[in-house]
Amino acid sequence: MAHISATLVKELRERTGAGMMECKKALVDTQGDVELAIDNMRKSGQAKAAKKSGRVASEGVILLEISSEQKLGAILELNCETDFVAKDASFKSFAEEIISTALKEKITSSELLKAKFEEQRTALVAKIGENINIRRIAMLESEALGSYLHGARIGVLVSAVGADQKCLKNLAMHIAASKPEYVNSEDVPSEVVNREHQVQLDIAMQSGKPRDIAEKMVSGRMKKFTGEISLTGQNFVMEPTKTVGDWLEEHGATVLNFIRFEVGEGIEKSTTNFADEVAAISKKEV
């Protein structure tokens, strides 16, 4: 039997909302395969939906900077260990220097930035006593760029055609709040669609419906699924009776691309207390 770590159980709990023992059993059944465990739990009704992977967040800041010509934008995530340091003036100044250099020299590789700023990073670590990591950098280039920064923890860059700055700002705010993964439903990769289709079909078939009826049920569910994860298919947060796609059409605008960063997405913190909890339960089962 595969070893099921506390970390795996914790991830499955966070992504499904199911109980610890249900998650542990599901992982045992799948030999530690989290994605397969999620699919199986959804089919059995133990998990209504799976949250996008993103374990307990690390600390740090998101920074945005747009060129003077307003045609190139950069977005950076710089991590530290505590919220206290994230608010430190020296830490913020370091982040600002990194993003300004990245934008000026068009550096889109975090590894190149790490090499370039290693001496300053080491000195700052020695000064404040916490590890600091240049986690990621990205850029967006377009004739029309919009941006939004929410409390230095969520940042968005968005490019579009036919949109003024007010329209772009509203779009960026929506993206920050609603977390779309793709621009249009047609952009959702076939493997993502196929996987969800199979899960929904298995759920529908369990109700005892004939396959043709089940397929019709799934068709509606899939339209909802792709709509919810694509920008243009989501209900617009500022006018919930309209989709973003409808709102864009009214304004004669088309979104080309967007980038959304949130501090600590997918970064795992220490799970000591949770591990102790799992270990205690494991001992009871022996």
Curated annotation (Swiss-Prot):
UniProt superkingdom: Bacteria
Cellular component, GO, one term: cytoplasm
Gene3D superfamilies the record matches: 1.10.286.20, DNA helicase RuvA subunit, C-terminal domain (1.10.8.10), Elongation factor Ts, dimerisation domain (3.30.479.20)
Subcellular compartments: Cytoplasm
Region named Involved in Mg(2+) ion dislocation from EF-Tu: 82-85
Molecular function as annotated in GO: translation elongation factor activity
InterPro entries: EF-Ts_dimer_sf (IPR036402), Transl_elong_EFTs/EF1B (IPR001816), Transl_elong_EFTs/EF1B_dimer (IPR014039), Transl_elong_Ts_CS (IPR018101), UBA-like_sf (IPR009060)
Keywords tagged on the record: Cytoplasm, Elongation factor, Protein biosynthesis
Function (record text): Associates with the EF-Tu.GDP complex and induces the exchange of GDP to GTP. It remains bound to the aminoacyl-tRNA.EF-Tu.GTP complex up to the GTP hydrolysis stage on the ribosome.
PANTHER family, alphabetized: ELONGATION FACTOR TS (PTHR11741), ELONGATION FACTOR TS, MITOCHONDRIAL (PTHR11741:SF0)
Sequence similarity: Belongs to the EF-Ts family.
HAMAP family found in the cross-reference section: EF_Ts (MF_00050)
Protein name: Elongation factor Ts
Organism: Hamiltonella defensa subsp. Acyrthosiphon pisum (strain 5AT)
Name of the encoding gene: tsf
